[in-house]
Amino acid sequence: MSAITVGVVVFPGSNCDHDTAYALASFAGVKPVMLWHNNHDLQGAQAIVLPGGFSYGDYLRAGAIARFSPLMKEVVEFARKGYPVLGICNGFQVLLESGLLEGALSRNRDKKFLCCQTTITPVNCSTRFTEDYHQGEVLRIPIAHGEGNYFAPPEVLESLQEHNQIAFQYCNAQGEVTVEANPNGSLLNIAGIVNRAGNVLGLMPHPERASDAALGSVDGRLLFESLFRSLTGV
């Protein structure tokens, strides 16, 4: 079986691109390729990851400039054809700015940058990113962001719920979705959402930082396993 090629987009200011590539390369049969933002060539990628960082220094607002990168035209078309696209932290912000996902991410509730371990629970376990998870389980996955406060108008929130597009919610250690467990003020404790087709996922927690036992958690690893299983049919 030929290797699965996964493109990792590199913007000026990305700082989790190599972490993400390292996590991807830890899976047998997976070949990460770095995709510079100023190109148009996806290098035969079967999936795309927009990693965390501070693309273009987060000027204007997080992800606002990155959406205009030449490569993003290809990523948007790639996603609209039904191929999988994952946005992590700043990558989630870019997906929102690009219109591939609905809503917006604003400054954290307390206006402080947060870098800490969080617990989240899977809500929709039927997407190609989440099939290896189980509803109600508690995942330990860290966050590191200043603008992770998810906001959307009431009609968008209703639509997300109606179409099962909330992928992950912040929860406590018992798996309860509570105000106290919400680190940044996100509406409905939203930690990640998918598009209606289920092929585009954006989340603020960093699964690549929870994919190796040496990092204290492997709970993020199943997200990548789910994706690769969907690509290989195994």
From Swiss-Prot:
It comes from the Bacteria. CDD domains: GATase1_FGAR_AT. Residues 6-234 form the Glutamine amidotransferase type-1 domain. SMART domains: GATase_5. The active site is at C89 (nucleophile), H206, E208. Keywords: ATP-binding, Cytoplasm, Glutamine amidotransferase, Hydrolase, Ligase, Nucleotide-binding, Purine biosynthesis. GO terms for molecular function: ATP binding; glutaminase activity; phosphoribosylformylglycinamidine synthase activity. One of its GO terms (cellular component) is cytoplasm. One of its GO terms (biological process) is 'de novo' IMP biosynthetic process. It is found in: Cytoplasm. Gene3D superfamilies: 3.40.50.880. Its EC number is 6.3.5.3, 3.5.1.2. Pathway: Purine metabolism; IMP biosynthesis via de novo pathway; 5-amino-1-(5-phospho-D-ribosyl)imidazole from N(2)-formyl-N(1)-(5-phospho-D-ribosyl)glycinamide: step 1/2. It holds the Pfam family GATase_5. It catalyses: N(2)-formyl-N(1)-(5-phospho-beta-D-ribosyl)glycinamide + L-glutamine + ATP + H2O = 2-formamido-N(1)-(5-O-phospho-beta-D-ribosyl)acetamidine + L-glutamate + ADP + phosphate + H(+); L-glutamine + H2O = L-glutamate + NH4(+). Part of the phosphoribosylformylglycinamidine synthase complex involved in the purines biosynthetic pathway. Catalyzes the ATP-dependent conversion of formylglycinamide ribonucleotide (FGAR) and glutamine to yield formylglycinamidine ribonucleotide (FGAM) and glutamate. The FGAM synthase complex is composed of three subunits. PurQ produces an ammonia molecule by converting glutamine to glutamate. PurL transfers the ammonia molecule to FGAR to form FGAM in an ATP-dependent manner. Part of the FGAM synthase complex composed of 1 PurL, 1 PurQ and 2 PurS subunits. This is Phosphoribosylformylglycinamidine synthase subunit PurQ. It comes from Chlorobium chlorochromatii (strain CaD3). The gene is purQ.
